[in-house]
Amino acid sequence: MEVMTLERTLTELDHVRLLNLLRRDTRGDGFLAQRRAMEDMLDTATLVPSREVAGDVVTMYSQVLLKDLQTGQQQTLTLSYPADAQPAGGFVSVLSPVGCALLGLTVGSVARWSTPKGEEMAAEILAIHFQPESSGDYAM
């Protein structure tokens, strides 16, 4: 899995939680590329306190409106931790290819990722409908 290198901003809390999540990750070798992409993103992201993150940044549990650049179809997704992921309900795991591609990007950015089947995907972030930090929830 390849994730385009883009400027990423993460809250310090999300960063710590994701590092801990990766330490406990017991998935097999089939997820090595995905794991490396997440580790690279965590290593290079700009970290900010939760109270200082801009409202246009995709953080954990942000609900985002995406536009598929191939089909033009719009879709709303919520970025979640694996235990809360329900893809059919629009909750995608941060450890999924699309979840990793979205985290830390801003409205107007294009997220690019490869599906497990090798299909290249791209979607523009049109809006953030909900971001916990903008609502005063700094511990979600």
Region annotations inferred by a language model:
Residues 1-55:
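N-terminal intrinsically disordered, low-complexity, charge/repeat-rich segments that act as generic
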Residues 16, 77, 123:
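A broad, low-specificity signal marking well-ordered, structured residues that form hydrophobic/aromatic
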Residues 61-63, 70-120:
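Non-DNA-binding regulatory cores of transcription-related proteins
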